[in-house]
Regions:
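Non-catalytic alpha-helical scaffolds and adjoining flexible linkers that form interface surfaces
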Residues: 1-160
Length: 160
């Protein structure tokens, strides 16, 4: 089931990204909240929570995404992209001419709110990019296979 795959993915990320026996209280507390959400809520809610958990995990490992305002203009509205270099949001207007170089920012991670199930695939692609670049790639490690399977399964569920 998809919920079990989500839990397995989170545990694999923790296992493979964090040093053994190093305290990580925020990661632990975040995992407990995620587990409650996976257990108690439907697919749309827990998948959104899972992606937010991955974003929080990236922050705890030293690469915090700045998704609350445009890195170029400072605007907080119409955020549509993420800079692959800085990990910061870019507005629709500021990013239009660089659209092909920017990563899509799923609207459920902005004030726009949830619009379509494909956003879950976009959210997982967003976090995977930064996992590869700043967490696993630094040590020449692949993203954990349970995380890859979760992405593939979500892609199949929400294919247009």
């Amino acid at each position: 089931p998809l919920k079990l795959l989500g839990l397995t993915s989170a545990v694999a990320i923790i296992d493979q990204a964090l040093p053994d026996r190093e305290p990580a209280a925020e990661v632990w507390h975040g995992l407990l909240v995620l587990l409650d959400t996976i257990t108690d809520y439907d697919e749309y809610i827990w998948l959104a929570a899972y992606i937010r958990w991955e974003i929080g995990f990236l922050g705890e490992t030293g690469f915090k995404l700045g998704l609350d305002k445009c890195v170029v203009t400072g605007d907080v509205e119409d955020l549509s992209f993420v800079s692959p270099k800085s990990g910061c949001a870019v507005s629709d207007v500021a990013g239009e001419q660089y659209r092909d170089k920017l990563l899509p920012l799923p609207s459920f991670l902005t004030s726009k709110g949830f619009k379509a199930p494909k956003e879950f695939s976009e959210g997982l692609q967003l976090t995977e990019y930064f996992f590869k670049r700043h967490v696993f790639g630094v040590y020449n490690k692949p993203v954990p296979s349970p995380r890859q399977r979760l992405f593939e399964r979500v892609e199949m569920l929400h294919a247009d």
